[in-house]
Amino acid sequence: MDSIGINRAPLGSSSSAAAVTARRGIALRPARRSVASTNRVGVATIGFGDASGLRACSEKVRRFDSVRSTTARAQNGNAGRSMTEERGCTMSDTEMPFKYSSGKAFPLGVSQVEGGLNFALFSQHASSVILCLKLPGRGTEDEKGADVVEFVLDQQKNKTGDIWHVIVEGLPASGVLYGYRVGGPQGWDQGHRFDSSTVLLDPYAKLVSGRKYFGVAEEKSSQHFGTYDFDSSPFDWGDDYRLPNLPEADLVIYEMNVRAFTADESSGLDSTSRGSYLGLIDKIPHLLELGVNAVELLPVFEYDELEFKRYPNPRDHMVNTWGYSTINFFAPMSRYASAGGGPVAASKELKQMVKELHKAGIEVILDVVYNHTNEADDAHPYMTSFRGIDNKVYYMLDLNKNAELLNFSGCGNTLNCNHPVVKELILDSLRHWVEEYHIDGFRFDLASVLCRGPDGCPLDAPPLIKEIAKDAVLSRCKIIAEPWDCGGLYLVGRFPNWDRWAEWNGKYRDDLRRFIKGDPGMKGVFATRVSGSADLYQVNERKPYHGVNFVIAHDGFTLCDLVSYNLKHNDANGEGGCDGCNDNFSWNCGVEGETNDLNVLSLRSRQMKNFHVALMISQGTPMMLMGDEYGHTRYGNNNSYGHDTCINNFQWEQLEQRRDGHFRFFSEMIKFRHSNPILRRDRFLNKNDVTWHEDCWENQESKFLAFTVHDHNSGGDIYLAFNAHDYFVDAVIPPPPHHKCWNRVVDTNLESPNDIVPEGVPFTGPKYRIAPYSSILLKAKP
């Protein structure tokens, strides 16, 4: 083992960074192309980078003053200890002895090995890599000093292929923060963005330390650093190896935001657990009462909620609460820990949340964002990790336009997903979440990006998509694609699937909205959508459940707003009304926005119920949005990603106010689906499975559809009728099956509790008078 000198480095010191740069022969990029660095503003955690920007942050966050330094380095393979003195500082050889060896290339990230910790980082184009370690502080939380160590890696001894690596002995088993300075070519037009003065986050860091409290503006400039915890005992999963493993056809998915679910004071939780993983555990009884059996969590990877505060702009008042601004693909969002607990607590509490959901029979699906990162675009560049480690590998570039970032994500950059190294990172990330956190499935944001090659062109057989489908660790996971991107690659019904991939059915959303609000010419496509969208999925030899049916998702209007607004109202977003979709297929029922008109409110209530009935009787996998069970409003904002307020937060007092009406209807309708297998077949309907009570399909003005779904086992047929006309329709009811009679279960025109009666109300008439904008459901019973 070689021993090295230890230097106390003011990692907030520009002179130190410059000295390292000079020693390694690296020329800094011209200032005109300077990448915004988190090091050059106030630092909340360590203070790597330029000391000129250091300032005091929140009292609750540790501050680190500049301390004198020298830089630890290996010297031409000498076994002795060397110390390079800077700024007149010397240290004794015994003050903080560390030893190092060359290390190994795999696994990437930090790992325990015999005798120490191995650090491994990929960078194909780097010419220098420096490992930066911030050791646990001594004394109290408010201690100003910090012990910092840097290791300059040797290209001969500490590099295998494109992997830089080193083993360090004597480090604590937890509490160390680490990052890398990476230097390399300065050819911007060749795709390089190296800046060795910036300390970068390890892409394979399993835990990330950043600001302590969610959305605290005083901490906006804090950096994010990798950390690890080899001290804690393995998490006790108990019997959680028995995952729910629900059939896809049986799922009812509830899309939700961990923070927004309990952040509001009306949740009744104390301030330490509101908006946290533990807070969600407290509300599992609500999920069970509603009847959902899978939660789809908006991103819980570490993300930057204060990305809008990097520079003055019209959005700098906003806080990203949706989480589509990924910093790291392996670490859980640390600020979802209770009481500002940090990354280690976040990991443990997320596991506890998953364990408790599984105990309740609820699967956990993660919304994952592998299409872009938080590092923005070239106009407002920001360097956290990938850009400075190897921009040319990690991002799609237009090499015909000075290596500008391609933007198929709508967020400024696009991850180069099918590059072999990036592909493996994504697969490693997915396996990590399954193995370490027992996750049941994944929904892939803007998944069409994952179907593009390094030049941005669509691939017929994307390697990443295939390998996810065929991976042995992921073989039991639900994998769901959002089959479009912001570059126009719309793959609904055409997403490469290898018999595994399900899709968000965007056509279902649009066609149901148009029929229910009364658009002409929509009856036929409405019938196709509720019967499983065979036109999209049967042709590819898939199953009905491969189509995830939804009317509402986090993007766009809530269900209440869909029936309350004709236009989006996004002024609060600071984008001049240019954000959010303009084609919402919504109808305000006669008045734009809030109203006290009882007739309008009654019509809106019927329409929300109509949408929910259609969703729950459709073949395929239904998904609903958090808050729609009580009629949550965002006041017409159809792109509310940046509001850490009641606009997004679940309003528990409103749930209580509407529990006996709106909520009861939604809950009972979900339970009706669970109790009737003919509504969730694993094959497409044939002519013996359904009877369409219709003889004028070509009539474009017809807005009425009635049909019977047959139960070949017990004769429990279900009759459904949807009237999207603005007048009454007298529907002729077909005879019930032999020895059965019809029972009315649903009439959305009736007031609660008669709008849904689970046990049914006997109906004997030959006709049923169906009110305008209403739907009915009859069940055949003995």
From Swiss-Prot:
Function of the molecule: Starch-debranching enzyme that plays a role in the degradation of transitory starch during the night in leaf blades, facilitates the formation of spherical amyloplasts containing compound granules in the endosperm, and affects morphological characteristics of plastids.
Recorded coiled-coil stretches: none
Single annotated GO MF: isoamylase activity
InterPro entries in the cross-refs: GlgX_Isoamylase_N_E_set, Glyco_hydro_13_cat_dom, Glyco_hydro_13_N, Glyco_hydro_b, Glycoside_hydrolase_SF, Ig-like_fold, Ig_E-set, ISOA1-3-like_C
One GO CC term on file: amyloplast
The name this protein goes by in its record: Isoamylase 3, chloroplastic
Single Gene Ontology BP annotation: starch catabolic process
Catalytic residues identified in the record: D445, E482
Catalytic activity: Hydrolysis of (1->6)-alpha-D-glucosidic branch linkages in glycogen, amylopectin and their beta-limit dextrins
Tissue: Expressed in leaves. Expressed at low levels in developing endosperm.
Polar residues biased stretches: 68-81
